[in-house]
Amino acid sequence: MAKHLFTSESVSEGHPDKIADQISDAVLDAILQQDPKARVACETYVKTGMVLVGGEITTSAWVDIEEITRNTVREIGYVHSDMGFDANSCAVLSAIGKQSPDINQGVDRADPLEQGAGDQGLMFGYATNETDVLMPAPITYAHRLVQRQAEVRKNGTLPWLRPDAKSQVTFQYDDGKIVGIDAVVLSTQHAEDIDQKSLQEAVMEEIIKPILPSEWLNTSTKFFINPTGRFVIGGPMGDCGLTGRKIIVDTYGGMARHGGGAFSGKDPSKVDRSAAYAARYVAKNIVAAGLADRCEIQVSYAIGVAEPTSIMVETFGTEKVSSEQLTLLVREFFDLRPYGLIQMLDLLHPIYKETAAYGHFGRENFPWEKTDKAQLLRDAAGLK
């Protein structure tokens, strides 16, 4: 492969699409707290002065959609019309129906283990040993930059920052190993009264330098900080936002393949979400076990059918045991039926709003990030 560049991007919690994701998952969490077996497919649309929450929800719970929406927007930091969006005065519209009984009869079973998949589809999971969290470096550091932006905005270090921001990091690879960072882009919404030079210096000192490892930065690294020169109009006033529009930011930054299904607003019976989490769990444990340096898992389902229609293990030539053996180990140690993976990862809890910004993978507090099966896999593979 020799030398190549690879780029990933992330967006902050105040990006319009991410506002939508967080509202959808806040609604999901509120429902799961009362009714863990609820069926939820919650979509959100945000635009200047307005939030529309819709979808299909079947539950015994009652939740206040308007209050959840306003609280979520408030926590993100849109609390004044000067920012282009205000949690206290925006309109909140609701258009929610029930899940189709045709889908329901394919999912529900007398024996929970025979619970069918809520839809057909294909999902991917990925892991690599190039970072401590077994994630690709470009997306990991892109996330950390916008997380840092939110941190210094909220703690008052840089009070002129506003919630909307984007990051992009280009890494240099040589023969598959990281040798440096080629380019960094960080665009952040800001108050009217900060000049470009002061903004660029502060972003470099308070956001970029504390996050990016100095050994990967050199004199040829290019920095683009608010390259348009002005970013006052942002958030839903700058662009409308929709749930499920940042699926590459949510996953591996383009380093792995994607089955196309979004995550936010979906309860765990939707394999788009739960099976993608399970595939990450499988891939991460394989890499943590030292059975491969990189691992990508594909799993697929038919609607109403419990057993996956396929399982694929790809290790890009980095495997320490054969692909056939890896596939057998996956089938032996991981139950990838919809109910099985819900139990395996304990998914019927209100844990989803936190996933909806800064990536669903690579943060150790989520159950699919555990490496508790690594030693079992290593022993079963016969590696010392």
From Swiss-Prot:
Keyword match Ligase: no
Keyword DNA-binding on entry: no
Residues at which L-methionine binds: 56, 99, 239, 270
EC number: 2.5.1.6
Pathway: Amino-acid biosynthesis; S-adenosyl-L-methionine biosynthesis; S-adenosyl-L-methionine from L-methionine: step 1/1
Binding residues annotated for ATP, in chain numbering: 15, 164-166, 230-231, 239, 245-246, 262, 266
GO-annotated molecular function: ATP binding; magnesium ion binding; methionine adenosyltransferase activity
Essential cofactor(s): Mg(2+); K(+)
Cofactor binding, note field: Binds 2 divalent ions per subunit.
Signal peptide start-end: none
UniProt-annotated binding residues for K(+): 43
Reaction(s) catalysed (UniProt annotation): L-methionine + ATP + H2O = S-adenosyl-L-methionine + phosphate + diphosphate
Gene3D superfamilies attached to this UniProt entry: 3.30.300.10
Region (Flexible loop): 99-109
Task of the protein: Catalyzes the formation of S-adenosylmethionine (AdoMet) from methionine and ATP. The overall synthetic reaction is composed of two sequential steps, AdoMet formation and the subsequent tripolyphosphate hydrolysis which occurs prior to release of AdoMet from the enzyme.
HAMAP family: S_AdoMet_synth1
Subunit: Homotetramer; dimer of dimers.
Protein name: S-adenosylmethionine synthase
Biological source species: Salmonella arizonae (strain ATCC BAA-731 / CDC346-86 / RSK2980)
